[in-house]
Amino acid sequence: MGKVKYVLLDCDNTLCQSEHLAFEACADLTNELMAEKNIEQRYSAASLLEDFVGYNFRGMLNGLKQKHGFELSDAEMERYVSQELDRVTTKLSDKAVECPNVTTQLEWIKSQGYPMSVVSTSAKSRVVASLEKCNLDRFFKPEHVYSAATSLNPPSSKPDPKIYNYACEQLGVKNADAITVEDSKSGATAAMRAGIPCIAYVGIYGIEDSAEKMDQMGKLLTEQCKCVAVMKDWNEFPDILKKIESS
């Protein structure tokens, strides 16, 4: 594809180990919603992750509505979204850590002159909380942190490609001239639909689950989402980028 003109990066479980922390907070709030709607099922962080990894809370609520057959008024939706953001941001500000070797590779990307941007499905304040806690915010201009939940009107959520299309438009780069890194099916699907070559970062599954899950996700993201490479550790990034540019 020639020289990459922009490196786009997902945040949750790609740059920062934040997804499980966020889902711990989400599970408590989701169970409050289930009780309010007189639905017996209760969720753990693990069971929510299984069904909704890569979704923001608004997207998760829409999925729960469909799955359990209840309604939420606009006011209820906004109340729950606001509560979730407050709880998750507090937790991430306290406990988020970077994925292994991210700082080293962001330093390398910067040293090679590649511009970088974060393109997340999560609310911007939540993303910034994770980046700041991990000391990664120094790599990104504030205006180059994009959120499907808060940068778009109306809000969206991956796998909808709108946030990728919006980010590329704002950055002045053609979709096909950028690359991105994603860990989830929803994120990689958004990249695929936007026509942006995507590297599947599966190292997080080895950390949080197992080597078997890591291999399984690499296969899924390659076959179903057309990811151009699988990355098990961030230290593999320079070689992967070189192969992409020479392809």
Q: Where do the language-model regions lie?
A:
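A generic structural signal for short
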Residues: 49, 93-94, 116, 152-153, ...
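Asp-based, Mg2+/Mn2+-dependent phosphohydrolase catalytic module
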Residues: 1-4, 107, 124-247
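Hydrophobic, well-structured mid-protein blocks that either form specific transmembrane helices
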Residues: 116-119, 136
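Short beta->alpha linker loops
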Residues: 21, 55-56, 97-101, 122, ...
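Conserved phosphate-coupling serine/threonine residues in phosphotransfer and NTP-handling enzymes
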Residues: 14, 120-122
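N-terminal helical cap/lid subdomain that shapes the substrate entry/recognition surface
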Residues: 2-11, 15-103, 107-112
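Conserved SAM-binding loop
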Residues: 15, 116, 180-181
